[in-house]
């Protein structure tokens, strides 16, 4: 399994709405994630900075990248675009994090 981590942010005043939209995520989006080899996916919020820390385990980088091309993912991005900084293609502004420690 490949471990990945990334950071995003939520717009000021939108924290509760961001959480509400994830409880739960759409069933069809969850199915796409699982079908593309996604496991153990979590997002954490740091309330003082509004930073979102994502952690996910994936089976394959190509399958992970392919999620972005699915209609479900693109629809989700548009749905979330008003509560978080987004790129022109509606994907969330994010930065990958480099692992500096791991203990099994």
From Swiss-Prot:
Keywords: Carbohydrate metabolism, Cytoplasm, Isomerase, Rhamnose metabolism. The active site is at 22 (proton donor). Substrate binds at residues 18, 41, 76-77. GO terms for cellular component: cytoplasm. The keyword Cytoplasm applies. It comes from the Bacteria. Pfam families: rhaM. It catalyses: alpha-L-rhamnose = beta-L-rhamnose. One of its GO terms (molecular function) is L-rhamnose mutarotase activity. It is an enzyme of class 5 (isomerase). InterPro entries: Dimeric_a/b-barrel, L-rhamnose_mutarotase, Rham/fucose_mutarotase. Its EC number is 5.1.3.32. PANTHER family: L-RHAMNOSE MUTAROTASE. Belongs to the rhamnose mutarotase family. Involved in the anomeric conversion of L-rhamnose. This is L-rhamnose mutarotase. It comes from Opitutus terrae (strain DSM 11246 / JCM 15787 / PB90-1).
